[in-house]
Amino acid sequence: MNMQSTDEKYMKEALKQAKKAYALEETPIGCVIVHEGKIIARGYNRRNTDKSPLAHAEISAIKKASKKLGDWRLEECTLYVTLEPCQMCAGAIIQSRIPRVVVGCMNPKAGCAGSVLNLLDVQAFNHQAEVKTKVLEEECSLMMKQFFRELRAKQKMKKKSLFSE
């Protein structure tokens, strides 16, 4: 299997995690971490569910991967995530020494793997990660767009019902 099809295979698994977030009415972001050709950790966004700003997909997956490997250093792992990491998640990726990050769609408002800035390639830091972007971009982007379209429609209906009383 070539690298492109391998990346697509694991991004599809990250998309499955994003669907779990979607089902909880969370922003649909999913993540998997792969070590030696096997998924060792999965995570999805749970900020509202857990009432925590730290409950991002990447943070959840990094915690699980560290526990699984018995080490905070994830030096032989690849992280797959459906949406470009924010600054907090990029920091966690650097701290956990993940060497490769594969991103589904970019985040022009808060992305820290190339959109707004690239924290994963700051040479002054003690670690950098190779970043591959736009893997299954259309599927990842469509899920985000659909989620926010539905959210806006729900908010509009709620607002309408408040003013119709």
Regions found by a protein language model. Give the residues of each.
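Helix-adjacent hinge/juxtasegments
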Residues: 54-55, 59, 63-96, 100
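Active-site phosphate/pyrophosphate-handling residues
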Residues: 9, 38, 60
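Zinc-dependent deaminase
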Residues: 1-24, 88-165
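A short acidic/small-residue loop/turn micro-motif
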Residues: 47-49
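Short, basic and Ser/Thr-rich N-terminal targeting/leader segments
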Residues: 25-29, 75
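Short beta-strand scaffold segments in enzyme catalytic cores
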Residues: 29-37
